[in-house]
Amino acid sequence: VNTGSLPHLFARLAALERRIRAAVAARRAADTNPDDPFRGLYLSDEAIDALLATRREPFVPFQASAASGRLGRLAETAGLSGLDVELLLVALAPDVDSRFEQFYGYLNDDVTRRRATAGLALRLCGLPEASAAGRARLDPASPLRSAGLLVVDDRERPFLSRSLRVPDRVVGHLLGDDLLDATLVGVARVVDEVVPADAGRLHRALRAQVRLAYLRERPGGGARELAAAALRHAGFAVLEVDAARLRAEPDQHALTAAVLREAVSRHAGIVLGPVEDEPPLTALTHPAIPLVVFGPNVWDPRWSADPPLLHDAAPLPVADRAELWQARLGGGLAPGVDPAAATAHFVLGPGQIARAARAASVSALVDGGVVTSEHLRAGARSQNAAGLHRLARRVEPAVGWGDLVLPSGVTGLLHELAARARHRGQVIDEWRMRPGGGRGRGVTGLFAGDSGTGKTMSAEVIAASLGLDLYTVNLATVVDKYVGETEKNLERIFTEAAGVNGVLLFDEADAIFGKRSEVRDAHDRYANIESAYLLQRMETFDGIAVLATNLRANLDEAFTRRLDVVVDFPLPDEPLRRLLWDRCLGVTAPRADVDLDFLASAFELAGGHIRSAAVTAAYLAADAGGPVGMAEVVGAVAREYRKLGRLVGEREFGRYLGLAVADVGR
């Protein structure tokens, strides 16, 4: 509460009281029956005769004086004239001093009308009731009413008999109350702490009286923080409004009026977003209040008749991100830890960096140490939006490069994909090697190979190496038989993924992609549209997206050449199979004599099937109460063969066929 402006407000109300005393004296002098105990409850013949004998004259004229304090700031922001201020004070008085209720009841000649009417207010301001200039100050388009500072009630009554009222929030503000209007809780908030951002162009525009701006939000651009910083630099407080919650309110008109009233009262600019559909711009427009709107889409000219200043909220340069990390973390870093380097592959805006730094500091405090690279990456991951969880399966990576058993050429391509993700800020932003053609800043890849060759695990390893989560989308569940629904499902996924720092893996990509053939029927045409849409959306995606398919031959070359990295996963050869068996059987499980050479040479299995067989063998051994031996492993392989539809024969199982056949009886 700030009461510094109260002396001036009380002085202005005291001056109003003196005019009211004079008005009461004049009324008494003309009263035909001042001692009537029922005056104001009925009209007598004498009262009517007195009305016929006199004219309704204004009270004693007065000289308006300049307002100061909160009243003066409010008048300046809302563009109020001296007359507007006096009308506001007349309407405000009963909410500050209850005696004014009786004063107004007496002057209205109606004890039930305890607020100033329009006619009484004009006369107290020295104007006749028929004054066009005075009536104009009470018009819905007037500064007082358009800003929500004054409400005219009793619309069914004649204009002069309508009551004037000041909203409670305006009364509270003038009395020093800085709490947000209760009706706006959950919809709007006052931004006290502004994250530093490079808002030069927008700041200059707001200084130059630009009152509508639209920021197209890019991942990591921090449009919200950019708008707040520009408003603060331009001398405004910041009122942030959640566009989705505002739209969801049943009485949107009353709520937008409350937002504008709050902004005018605080001398605040409005930050509205993120918007996707038509926002209520007209209801939030005021000549003195800047409105900065932000959203992920391009500006639609139909949203407003007034063209806005258009600005792209581009991702922060690497140097700016490093400066923000250092400013937020201070000296609490572990030796040798570079926050910018540890989180270089995360696309974070200023506000996200501030929150991630707080999360990292809290985690380090709980762990009883200083902030490490892992704390930083965990803090950055905590800024992921939650919407993608409903559309994709989230995987917290638990594997690393050492867990991969792949040919060196394949591993090299995987490292290249991770390097692209790690250094894209430097290459695209600093070196300005943007690909053009409307492509985004993202990294795209294709993993092709038979089931079990390591495609999903490789995506998990890449995510782990970058400190990111893996989000898996099964495209077979996205495809819809109804025309256009598949594209809508994909758009929802990419829209939610834009707010997430993670690796997006589209599994079973052949459910959508296929050789583009001649269009023979509507099914062919729409199948081609779906595949083209997925590729186009991947190209404009700013994140990391990988397609995984079992059918490499089904993919059109025109598609694969537009992806950054294409990795073919072959079936493992004998040396790799031996390594896989050794790795999958593990070092902690008790192991008897297992013939790894035989397993590798006899059974041509992919890595996924080898792992499945090893796990099955471990369960068989645990159930038997002994170590993992050839009996358990061969039995597990036999089960894997049956799952794959293969015959269990002597050619593969050789001298261990008896163990495989014996497993059938288990």
Predicted regions: what they are:
Residues 141-142:
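Short, hydrophobic-biased segments on the C-terminal half of alpha helices
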